[in-house]
Amino acid sequence: MTTDDGFGAEGTIPDADLPAIPVSAGALVFDHAGRLLILKPTYKSGWTIPGGVMEADGETPWEACRREVAEETGLDIGAGHQARLACMDFRRPRPGKPGGIRFLFDWGAFGDATLGGIVVQPEEISEYRLADLRTALSLLRKPIRRRVRAATRGRRLRYLEDGLPVPGVGERPARR
């Protein structure tokens, strides 16, 4: 039984009413020359950025991002490093694809000492490279390309739907 406010009798939300939406998180990792770290996965075509799906055990998007980047590249962001949320993208479901929510974090730029320590997970990643943004965008798969392009344009937080900015969201609110 649900009450008028949508909660169950005990103040909980009935599980049947909750959407099952996959959440993933990716990372923009640059070198000091402004080149973006991109990866070639073994399990799908094209290039991507480091990141992956959030675990269902209560992991947060930021924790998923750190875990996936460490698993795929060996890079681990320490507690003292500052990253920023670059965008959040709502992907609509499509036939055979569940859709989901994608977080993209900008980890900033790293030096050769850090990036020289990249060790890819060969079961998942066949190759990596640092590419200037134009080249990286041309290699990335379309949904990721849109997200990265939007996130790097103006370096402001972006809300996207299917990889595209939503008119009226993210702009300055009108003064009233």
Regions found by a protein language model. Name each.
Residues S45-W47, Q121-R176:
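Nudix hydrolase/Nudix homology domain
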